[in-house]
C-alpha cells in the first residue's frame, strides 16, 4: 500500500484538516498492526502531507451589516434562495446541493439532512454520499424565512427547465444503516433554471465573488455563510449545545472554537450588560 500516494490523491478534493485526520488515523492503525506483529514495517515511515490546515483566524464570517448588503446584492440572482437558506439553517454546501423534496416535512416544518451531493471535477461526475459524520445526520426546524424559501421553489417547480441528466440515479452507502441508498437527481430542490441541472460546487463561489464585489464587501466562500449562521445564532442567545446539534457537530469544542465568532458589536453589548449589572449591584 502506497500511503503517500493516497494522501497526495486527497489534496485536490479534501480540506487540509481532513487529510491531517486521515494521516493520523493511518499512522495509529499501522502502528498498532506493527506492534501486534501483523506487519514487519510501518508503511507510514517517511510519509508526509503538505496541504496546510486552515487556521481558525482565517475563517471568514459576515457582520450584520455585511450580511444585509450581501443579501440585497443577491436579490434577483439565480442562487439567492440557496444563499439565504444556508444563512437560515447552517447547512453545508454539499448538504444544500443534495437536498431533496422528501427530506422536507411541510407539516412539521423541518428539514432532514441525510445525504450530500457534489461534483467531482477530476472524475467529471456527480457523486452522492452520506453526511460528513454520523453526527451530521440531523433534523432542523425551519424558520419562517427558510420555510418560505422552500415553499416558493416547491410551488413553482413545474415551470423549471429540466435536463436529461436529471434522470440519473446515484447510489451511496448510508453511514448509519450500512445499506445502499439512492439519490434521484430529479428530486433535488435546487436546479439551475438555465441548465436544468444542479449548480456545481465551485460555481457558487465564483458567483459569490461577483456579488461581494457588487455589495462592496470582502470576498468570501460558501462556507462563510455557515459560519455566519452560527455567529448570528449565538448573538441571538441560542445555547451552544443547541447550535452544536443544528450544525451537526459531534463535539461542542468544534462548534465554539471554529464556528462561533465574537464580533465587535457583541463585545460592546457584553460590556454594556456587565456595566449595567455592576451598577445594579451598587444599588
Question: Model-derived features: where do they sit?
Answer:
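Short, contiguous acidic/charged loop-to-helix segments that flank catalytic cores in large enzymes
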Residues: 127-137, 191-200, 216-224, 262
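N-terminal core-binding DNA-recognition domain of tyrosine site-specific recombinases/integrases
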Residues: 1-38, 196-203, 218-224
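Basic, Lys/Arg- and aromatic-enriched nucleic-acid-binding interface segment
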Residues: 16, 20-22, 35, 39-99, ...
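Active-site/catalytic core of tyrosine-dependent DNA strand-transfer enzymes
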Residues: 143-217
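Exposed loop/turn and edge beta-strand positions of beta-sandwich/beta-sheet ligand-binding modules
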Residues: 56, 79, 107, 136, ...
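C-terminal secondary-structure termini that scaffold catalytic or DNA-interacting sites
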Residues: 108, 119-121, 125-137, 144-146, ...
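Catalytic-site neighborhood detector that most strongly recognizes the C-terminal catalytic loop/helix
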Residues: 53-54, 61, 117, 228, ...
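C-terminal catalytic core of tyrosine-transesterase DNA break-rejoin enzymes
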Residues: 17, 35, 84, 88-95, ...
Amino acid at each position: 500500500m502506497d500511503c503517500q500516494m493516497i494522501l497526495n490523491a486527497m489534496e485536490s478534493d479534501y480540506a487540509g484538516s481532513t487529510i491531517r485526520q486521515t494521516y493520523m488515523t493511518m499512522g495509529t492503525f499501522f502502528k498498532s498492526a506493527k506492534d501486534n506483529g501483523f506487519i514487519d514495517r510501518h508503511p507510514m515511515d517517511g510519509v508526509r502531507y503538505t496541504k496546510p490546515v486552515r487556521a481558525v483566524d482565517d475563517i471568514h464570517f459576515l457582520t450584520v451589516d455585511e450580511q444585509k448588503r450581501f443579501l440585497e446584492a443577491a436579490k434577483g440572482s439565480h442562487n439567492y434562495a440557496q444563499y439565504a437558506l444556508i444563512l437560515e439553517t447552517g447547512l453545508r454546501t454539499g448538504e444544500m446541493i443534495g437536498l431533496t423534496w422528501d427530506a422536507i416535512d411541510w407539516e412539521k416544518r423541518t428539514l432532514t439532512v441525510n445525504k450530500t451531493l457534489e461534483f467531482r471535477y477530476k472524475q467529471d461526475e456527480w457523486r452522492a454520499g452520506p453526511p460528513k459524520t454520523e453526527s451530521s445526520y440531523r433534523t432542523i426546524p425551519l424558520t419562517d424565512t427558510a420555510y418560505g424559501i422552500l415553499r416558493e421553489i416547491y410551488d413553482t417547480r413545474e415551470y423549471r427547465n429540466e435536463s436529461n441528466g436529471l434522470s440519473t440515479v446515484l447510489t451511496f452507502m448510508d453511514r448509519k444503516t450500512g445499506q445502499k441508498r439512492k439519490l434521484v437527481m430529479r428530486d433535488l430542490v435546487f436546479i439551475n433554471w438555465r441548465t436544468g441541472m444542479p449548480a456545481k460546487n465551485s460555481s457558487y463561489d465564483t458567483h459569490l465573488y461577483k456579488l461581494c464585489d457588487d455589495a462592496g464587501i470582502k470576498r468570501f466562500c460558501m462556507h462563510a455563510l455557515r459560519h455566519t449562521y452560527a455567529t448570528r445564532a449565538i448573538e441571538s442567545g441560542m445555547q451552544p449545545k443547541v447550535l452544536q446539534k443544528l450544525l451537526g457537530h459531534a463535539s461542542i469544542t468544534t462548534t465554539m472554537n471554529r464556528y462561533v465568532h465574537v464580533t465587535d458589536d457583541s463585545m460592546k453589548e457584553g460590556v454594556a450588560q456587565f456595566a449595567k449589572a455592576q451598577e445594579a449591584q451598587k444599588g
